[in-house]
Regions:
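Anion (oxyanion) recognition and catalysis
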Residues: 106
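Structured binding elements
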Residues: 109
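Short alpha-helical interface patches
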Residues: 21-22, 37, 64
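Conserved AMP-binding/adenylate-forming core of the ANL superfamily
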Residues: 45, 49-103
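A short N-terminal helical cap/helix-turn-helix that marks the beginning
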Residues: 1-8, 27-49
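Active-site diphosphate/adenylate-binding microenvironment
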Residues: 22-27, 94
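Short, contiguous pre-domain boundary segments
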Residues: 12-21
Length: 110
């Protein structure tokens, strides 16, 4: 998938990398759809996010989990009237829900 977003993917040295790294970013690029949901198609069961609480509790999210949960978050935000180009301040102190909500907001273009 990286070939979709980089003009060159193989480099001969660090200097070559620094001089020739160039991103391809489509005008309608949406991280949630173009990257995360694509990974959900390619590797749905691979761990995409490992969240750890201050108490050591761990929650693992696969790419498919993130797709499904961010779809739900997007639908919820949309039901509140949030849409494309809306500004949203999201404050969730070190909670895994921040990632789900942020991807959902990306899907709306908010």
């Amino acid at each position: 998938m990286i070939e979709r977003f980089l003009k060159q993917t193989h480099f001969t040295s660090e200097q070559d990398f620094k001089e020739h790294l160039e991103f391809i970013i489509p005008e309608d690029f949406n991280f949630a759809y173009d990257v995360m949901d694509e990974w959900a198609k390619i590797k749905p069961d691979h761990v995409a996010l490992l969240w750890t609480s201050e108490r050591g509790e761990e929650i693992r999210f696969t790419y498919q989990d993130l797709k499904e949960q961010s779809d739900k978050a997007a639908a919820y935000f949309q039901s509140l009237g949030i849409g494309h180009d809306d500004k949203v301040m999201l404050i969730l102190k070190r909670h895994y829900q921040w990632w789900l909500a942020m991807l959902g907001l990306h899907k709306l273009g908010a």
